[in-house]
C-alpha cells in the first residue's frame, strides 16, 4: 500500500487565519490517522509580498497547535527544478509566451464582462508568428507564460465533494510564469507534489477550479495526480474568511484572547463535519476519531462565541496536574488547587484565573458602582462568625433575608459588586472562602 503523504502549503504573505489552519489540521490528522507523513511547504514565489516574519509566525502557530512536520522546504529553493519543467512543457507546447501588458489584459477582462462573457483569456498570443513576437521584444516587452488547457472534459473523485466535472473550455489558460521571471503558485505546486510524492491534498473549495487545471498539468507531466478533498469555505455571517479580511488570525486567538491550543485544534478540525464538536485533550485522540468522509459540502459558519464555549469546556475538564504546568506558562504558579477548583467553572480562558486571584487578594475599585452603602453595612454585621466556608454564603443570605426581606438579585447583586466589582463570575459561595474575613468586612463597609 502506498504511504500516505500530505502537505500544507501556506504563502508567507500574512498571518495564519482560521480558514487555512483548518486545512493544516486536516492534512496533519489525515496523515497521522494513516501512519503517514506531513510536509510543510512555503509557497514563497511572490517575491514582493513574501516575508520572513510571516514564515516565522506560521511556524510558531503550527508548533503551538502541536502540528509537527516531517519535512519542510520553500519554493524559492527549487527554482532550477521549475525552470527545467518550464523547458519541458515548452517543448511539449503546453506553455506559450504572451506579451500583453497588465493594462491590456484588464481592458480585455472588462470588455468580456461588459458583454456578459466569462473573463477567459482569448489566446491571442497562442499563435503569434516569429515576426510578431520579435516586434513585442523590440518594444522591450517581457513575456509571461501561460499553461495551455486542453478543451476536453476534466473529472476526478473528490474525498468530500464526490464526483467533480469541468469542461476545459470553461477554464482560462493560467499564467504560470510572470513577466519578471518569477513563478506563480499553479505549476510550482504540481511539480512539488510530484517530486515529494504527495498522495492526498485537503484544501478549500476556492481551489476547485485550480485543481481542474492542475489535473491537466499532472497529465502533461505523465504523473497520476494526488487524491483531492475540497472543504466548504468557513464564513462569518456574509463574508468568507481569509487573511485579507483580517481579525481571525490564530495569533490573535492564542495571544490576545487566550484560547487553548487543543480548543482551537478540536474546534476547527471538527467544524463542518457530522461529528460532535468536543474538547479533545490531545492530537492523538483527535486523529483517532478523524474521518474525512464526515465533512459537509455546505458552507460552514464560524461564530467566535462557539470557540470560546469550547475553550471553557476544555478548561473545566482538565485535571490540576495538567493545569499546574499551564499556570507556569502564564506566570501564575502561585495558584493552588483549591483556588483553581473554586473559580474554574466560570473561566473563559486560563488567564482569567489571574484576574480572579487579584480580585480575591486586592481590594477592587467600586467607586463608580453607586452601591447601597447602608444595606452593605447591615450585611457586614450579619456575616457569620468564625471561619468562612462554602456553607457561609447560604447561612449569611438566609439571615439577610430574615432581617431585610431582600431576595434574589436585590439581595446578592450588591454583595457581588461590593466584593468583586463584577456583575458575573464564579459563585459567591465559592469565592467567599478565598477572601480573608477582615477583607470581606472592609469591602462591605468601605464601599
Swiss-Prot record:
Q: Give the chief site where it resides.
A: cytoplasm
Q: Which PANTHER family match?
A: GLUTAMATE--TRNA LIGASE, GLUTAMATE--TRNA LIGASE, MITOCHONDRIAL-RELATED
| InterPro entries the UniProt entry points to | aa-tRNA-synth_I_cd-bd, aa-tRNA-synth_I_codon-bd_sub2, aa-tRNA-synth_I_CS, aa_tRNA-synth_I_cd-bd_sf, Glu-tRNA-ligase_bac/mito, Glu/Gln-tRNA-synth, Glu/Gln-tRNA-synth_Ib_cat-dom, GluQ/Sye
Task of the protein:
Catalyzes the attachment of glutamate to tRNA(Glu) in a two-step reaction: glutamate is first activated by ATP to form Glu-AMP and then transferred to the acceptor end of tRNA(Glu).
Q: Which residues bind ATP?
A: 243
Record-given protein name: Glutamate--tRNA ligase 1
Q: How does it assemble?
A: Monomer.
Keywords, sorted A to Z: Aminoacyl-tRNA synthetase, ATP-binding, Cytoplasm, Ligase, Nucleotide-binding, Protein biosynthesis
The Gene Ontology biological process terms listed for this entry are:
glutamyl-tRNA aminoacylation
The protein's organism comes out as Rickettsia conorii (strain ATCC VR-613 / Malish 7)
> Which gene carries the instructions for this protein?
gltX1
Q: Per the record, GO CC terms?
A: cytoplasm
Pfam families, per the entry: Anticodon_2 (PF19269), tRNA-synt_1c (PF00749)
Q: Which CDD domains match?
A: GluRS_core (cd00808)
Q: Where is this motif: 'KMSKS' region?
A: 240-244
Tell me where it resides. Cytoplasm
Task: Check the record and name the HAMAP family matching this protein.
Answer: Glu_tRNA_synth_type1
Q: Name one GO molecular function term.
A: ATP binding
Q: Where is this motif: 'HIGH' region?
A: 10-20
Q: Which reaction does it catalyse?
A: tRNA(Glu) + L-glutamate + ATP = L-glutamyl-tRNA(Glu) + AMP + diphosphate
- Family note: Belongs to the class-I aminoacyl-tRNA synthetase family. Glutamate--tRNA ligase type 1 subfamily.
Q: Which Gene3D superfamilies match?
A: 1.10.10.350, HUPs
Q: What is its EC number?
A: 6.1.1.17
Coiled-coil stretches, from where to where? none
Amino acid at each position: 500500500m502506498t504511504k500516505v503523504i500530505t502537505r500544507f502549503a501556506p504563502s508567507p504573505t500574512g498571518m495564519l487565519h482560521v480558514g487555512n489552519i483548518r486545512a493544516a489540521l486536516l492534512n496533519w490528522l489525515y496523515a497521522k490517522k494513516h501512519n503517514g507523513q506531513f510536509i510543510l511547504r512555503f509557497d514563497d514565489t511572490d517575491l514582493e509580498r513574501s516575508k520572513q516574519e510571516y514564515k516565522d509566525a506560521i511556524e510558531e502557530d503550527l508548533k503551538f497547535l502541536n502540528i509537527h512536520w516531517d519535512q519542510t522546504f520553500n519554493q524559492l529553493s527549487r527554482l532550477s527544478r521549475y525552470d527545467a519543467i518550464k523547458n519541458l512543457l515548452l517543448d511539449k507546447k503546453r506553455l506559450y509566451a504572451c506579451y500583453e501588458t497588465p493594462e491590456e489584459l484588464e481592458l480585455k477582462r472588462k470588455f468580456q464582462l461588459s458583454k456578459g462573457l466569462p473573463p477567459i483569456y482569448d489566446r491571442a498570443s497562442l499563435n503569434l508568428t516569429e515576426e510578431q513576437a520579435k516586434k513585442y521584444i523590440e518594444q522591450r516587452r517581457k513575456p509571461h507564460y501561460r499553461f495551455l488547457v486542453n478543451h476536453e472534459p476534466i473529472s476526478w473523485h473528490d474525498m468530500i465533494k464526490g464526483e467533480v466535472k469541468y469542461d476545459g473550455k470553461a477554464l482560462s489558460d493560467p499564467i504560470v510564469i510572470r513577466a519578471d521571471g518569477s513563478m506563480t503558485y499553479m505549476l510550482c505546486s504540481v511539480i512539488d507534489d510530484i517530486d515529494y510524492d504527495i498522495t492526498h491534498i485537503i484544501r478549500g473549495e476556492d481551489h476547485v477550479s485550480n485543481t481542474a487545471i492542475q489535473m491537466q498539468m499532472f497529465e502533461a507531466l505523465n504523473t497520476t495526480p494526488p487524491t483531492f478533498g475540497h472543504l466548504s469555505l468557513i464564513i462569518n455571517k456574509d463574508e468568507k474568511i481569509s487573511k485579507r479580511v483580517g481579525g481571525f488570525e490564530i495569533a490573535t486567538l492564542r495571544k490576545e484572547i487566550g484560547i487553548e491550543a487543543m480548543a482551537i485544534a478540536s474546534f476547527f478540525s471538527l467544524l463542518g463535519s457530522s461529528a460532535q464538536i468536543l474538547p479533545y485533550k490531545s492530537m492523538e485522540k483527535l486523529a483517532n476519531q478523524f474521518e474525512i468522509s464526515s465533512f459537509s459540502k455546505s458552507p460552514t459558519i464560524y461564530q467566535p462565541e462557539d470557540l470560546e464555549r469550547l475553550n471553557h469546556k476544555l478548561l473545566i475538564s482538565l485535571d490540576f496536574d495538567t493545569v499546574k504546568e499551564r499556570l507556569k506558562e502564564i506566570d501564575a504558579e502561585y495558584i493552588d488547587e483549591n483556588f483553581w477548583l473554586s473559580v474554574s467553572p466560570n473561566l473563559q480562558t486560563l488567564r482569567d484565573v489571574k484576574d480572579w486571584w487579584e480580585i480575591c487578594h486586592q481590594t477592587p475599585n467600586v467607586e463608580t458602582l453607586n452601591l447601597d452603602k447602608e444595606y452593605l453595612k447591615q450585611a457586614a454585621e450579619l456575616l457569620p462568625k468564625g471561619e468562612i466556608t462554602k456553607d457561609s454564603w447560604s447561612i449569611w443570605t438566609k439571615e439577610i433575608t430574615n432581617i431585610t426581606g431582600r431576595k434574589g438579585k436585590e439581595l446578592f447583586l450588591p454583595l457581588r459588586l461590593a466584593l468583586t466589582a463584577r456583575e458575573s463570575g464564579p459563585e459567591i459561595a465559592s469565592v467567599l472562602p478565598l477572601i480573608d474575613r477582615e477583607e470581606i468586612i472592609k469591602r462591605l463597609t468601605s464601599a
